[in-house]
């Protein structure tokens, strides 16, 4: 799970996406990768760092395809 968030954060920095919009795409990427039922709580408790997970949520719509595939 931590590797997923780290790779999403790296891809977010690569594409330079700002993360002010979508928490729903973050929950869909975390539920598809870890099959978690409460994915909004899983995105906030992704024990790496909460600021890093909130900044990676903007790139989740793009990095979901890259990381999961």
Curated annotation (Swiss-Prot):
Record field: compositional bias (Low complexity): 18-61
One Gene Ontology cellular component: extracellular region
Stretch forming the signal peptide: 1-18
Subcellular location: Secreted
Region (Disordered), start-end ranges: 17-69
Alphabetically ordered keywords of this record: Secreted, Signal
Domain of life: Eukaryota
Protein name: Putative uncharacterized protein DDB_G0271974
